[in-house]
């Protein structure tokens, strides 16, 4: 770290540099370049958040770490490596885990965290295609407490159009999130963070798909979705799961009007929306069926294989549920996201019990 240069937690970085429309959803506050391709990145996690709220034991929501990793890569790409604004970021894989959750307790002030980041180029063919990967160690108060990684490619409009056509969809016009106006022109969409899949994006041809249920025509948004408490959320609108047509299957409930999951218009299902679906299904599986205490997400590894469209049902299928090998051990889950028979994404998750927190009965206040 350069002499005399300390990380600042005073204000968020410009929102367009992390592909967010709302300033309130920007967690990264600063970055300092070190030797080689190494950085220290500062972020501030809120004491509370409508979607990413503390768990029953008072620790910060695990997906705050995932979103901070995403924002970190996008910010470094634009600010330090010259990836042009307006390029489409396509997610390949993400993983994260926690090694010491005690330091993640939410206190009387927002939680300052630091990511020790290493950057590497991968599958890199600039200037049309930038392939990049970051590895990050999460620290709080100087204590390492987690690690994670993210790999993406960023492509120009021509190559993005080719990727979309391979997926059977034309690329819709999606200008970058503006640093000036928080509202896109009528009929236009703004790029979200990182789409899932080896090439993933939009739902409708040439524009933004209207908010509809992933369950198909004839259903309103929210119809039949699981109660928020059953999936570990506080608000009804934050539940993204509906029972599927067969045992072990659930439908992803998409509400494009959700102010956090769909921070701005998009033409595909974003990675963070899929991750939220995986997380909620994991909570449901580990906290019901006789569990003595609720569980929290201790780690996840997500592989992105194909674009998830907005106007076709996305089904989440539980393919593995492995009980702890010993008392206090993690529950291991594997989930697949499927659309029209195409495997979109897979997630392997590790869940650990929240000590001293009893499970509430489904539907109780």
Language-model segment annotations:
Residues 1-57, 153-265, 362-365:
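Non-catalytic linker/capping segments at the edges of enzyme domains
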Residues 28-29, 91-93, 147, 297-299, ...:
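Hydrophobic residues on conserved beta-strands that form the core of alpha/beta folds
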Residues 57, 65-121:
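Ordered, small/hydrophobic-rich secondary-structure cores
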Residues 60-86, 269-292:
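Active-site helix/loop of acyl-thioester processing domains in fatty-acid/polyketide metabolism
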Residues 65, 92-94, 134, 276-280, ...:
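One face of beta-strands
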Residues 94-141, 297-343:
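Hydrophobic beta-sheet segments that form the core/acyl-binding groove
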Residues 124-171, 328-365:
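Mixed-charge, glycine-accented linear interaction segment located at domain edges/termini
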Residues 239-306, 310-313, 334-336:
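Acidic/His-leaning functional-site neighborhoods
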């Amino acid at each position: 770290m350069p002499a005399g240069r300390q990380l600042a937690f005073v204000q968020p970085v410009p929102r367009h540099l992390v592909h967010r429309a709302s300033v309130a959803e920007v967690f990264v506050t600063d970055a300092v370049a070190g030797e080689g391709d190494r950085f220290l990145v500062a972020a501030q996690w809120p004491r509370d958040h409508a979607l990413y709220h503390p768990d029953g034991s008072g620790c910060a929501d695990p997906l705050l770490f995932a979103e901070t990793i995403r924002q970190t890569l996008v910010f470094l790409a634009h600010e330090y490596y010259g990836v042009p604004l307006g390029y489409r970021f396509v997610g390949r894989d993400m993983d994260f885990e926690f090694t010491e959750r005690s330091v993640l307790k939410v206190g009387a002030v927002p939680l300052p965290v630091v990511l020790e980041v290493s950057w590497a180029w991968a599958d890199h063919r600039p200037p049309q295609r930038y392939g990049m990967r970051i590895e990050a160690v999460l620290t709080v108060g100087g204590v390492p407490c987690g690690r994670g990684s993210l790999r993406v490619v960023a492509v120009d409009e021509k190559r993005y159009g080719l990727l979309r056509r391979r997926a059977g969809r034309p690329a819709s016009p999606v200008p970058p999130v503006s640093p000036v106006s928080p509202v896109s022109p009528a009929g236009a969409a703004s790029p979200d963070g990182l789409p899932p899949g080896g090439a993933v994006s939009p739902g409708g041809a040439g524009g933004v798909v209207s908010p509809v249920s992933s369950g198909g025509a004839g259903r309103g948004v929210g119809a039949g979705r699981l109660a928020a408490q059953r999936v570990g959320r506080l608000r009804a609108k934050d539940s993204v799961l509906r029972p599927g047509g067969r045992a072990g299957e659930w439908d992803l409930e998409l509400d494009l009007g959700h102010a956090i999951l769909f921070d701005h218009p998009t033409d595909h299902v974003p990675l963070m929306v899929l991750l939220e679906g995986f997380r909620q299904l994991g909570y449901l599986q580990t906290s019901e069926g006789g569990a003595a205490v609720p569980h929290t997400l201790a780690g996840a590894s997500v592989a992105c294989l194909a674009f998830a469209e907005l106007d076709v049902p996305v089904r989440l299928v539980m393919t593995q549920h492995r009980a702890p090998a010993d008392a206090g051990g993690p529950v291991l889950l594997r989930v697949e996201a499927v659309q029209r028979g195409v495997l979109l994404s897979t997630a392997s998750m590790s869940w650990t019990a929240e000590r001293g927190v009893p499970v509430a009965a489904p539907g109780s206040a």
